[in-house]
Amino acid sequence: MAYERFTSAITLLLHWRNRLDPYWKLARGDRPVGFLLLLWPTWWALWLAADGVPPWWTLCVFTTGIWLTRSAGCVINDYTDRWLDPHVERTCTRPLVTGTVSPRNALLMFATLMLIAFGLVLTMNQLTVLLSVAGLFLAMTYPYLKRYTHLPQVYLGLAFGWGIPMAFAAIQGKVPTLAWLLYIANILWTTAYDTWYAMVDRDDDIKMGAKSIAILFAELDLVVQGVLYTLMLLTLCLVGLRATLSHTYWISLISAVALIGYQFIIARRREPTACFRAFMHNNWVGMTIFAGIALATTH
């Protein structure tokens, strides 16, 4: 009897695992790099706003909220891209394409994730709650941009960095100039690394009529990348000067320059797999800058 109960429990667990696995993949739970690329800039903001380690509850709310909103963003992105994904090699096996998740269930999942995230935001102050509404608008409208403009990467930067003004609002009750400088730096960074991502899908996107910076600038893509990363680093220099950060921050920026340079070495021939590696490598850039900020604000 005990053995039968054990095998029944294992069978039940495997059944639910198989049922939930497509939803986990839809939310990109199996690909944490997107979460990390969203996490680092928000942590930059939290540590700068608090001038050190932020309050534990605020840190928990923002970290959990980042995972929830990033997952929700992936769900709504796949929902709006279900016309395109079957024709792109990298995305043709996504759950909405294969039918393992229905469009209706995807929308329900998006709504559930966003409601939980909003519930967490409600524990913050009024300004943070108001800013979160703008963040919801950015998250919901981003997936449609690639149909109408060659600059969806810029809009992704607006959406991905919105945790920065929210973090300052939560801790300081205002959004100072420092927050907007950091926000601009993150827009430039996101635009740059998502252009690597767009270079992976460029050929398929051209066939399907989708738009991106990689398509717009064609052979000048690497030049544009260089300009974006340079402007990002210069803006982060302004952040360091305005916040009067110590030498550890400046060391982290120098390290970030080396890491970014390595991306151009990786992707110099524009091969899709190499461009994807360059995209993934930005996790180390974000982490390095965070380490510099965290050490510079340690008292």
Curated annotation (Swiss-Prot):
CDD domains: PT_UbiA_COQ2 (cd13959). Belongs to the UbiA prenyltransferase family. InterPro entries: HB_polyprenyltransferase-like, Prenyltransferase, UbiA_prenyltransferase, UbiA_prenylTrfase_CS, UbiA_sf. Its EC number is 2.5.1.39. One of its GO terms (biological process) is ubiquinone biosynthetic process. It comes from the Bacteria. The chain crosses the membrane at residues 33-53, 56-76, 107-127, 151-171, 180-200, 213-233, 247-267, 278-298. The keyword Cell membrane applies. The keyword Nucleotide-binding does not apply. It is a multi-pass membrane protein. One of its GO terms (cellular component) is plasma membrane. It is found in: Cell inner membrane. Catalyzes the prenylation of para-hydroxybenzoate (PHB) with an all-trans polyprenyl group. Mediates the second step in the final reaction sequence of ubiquinone-8 (UQ-8) biosynthesis, which is the condensation of the polyisoprenoid side chain with PHB, generating the first membrane-bound Q intermediate 3-octaprenyl-4-hydroxybenzoate. Its main location: membrane. Its cofactor is Mg(2+). GO terms for molecular function: 4-hydroxybenzoate polyprenyltransferase activity. Keywords: Cell inner membrane, Cell membrane, Magnesium, Membrane, Transferase, Transmembrane, Transmembrane helix, Ubiquinone biosynthesis. Pathway: Cofactor biosynthesis; ubiquinone biosynthesis. It catalyses: all-trans-octaprenyl diphosphate + 4-hydroxybenzoate = 4-hydroxy-3-(all-trans-octaprenyl)benzoate + diphosphate. This is 4-hydroxybenzoate octaprenyltransferase.
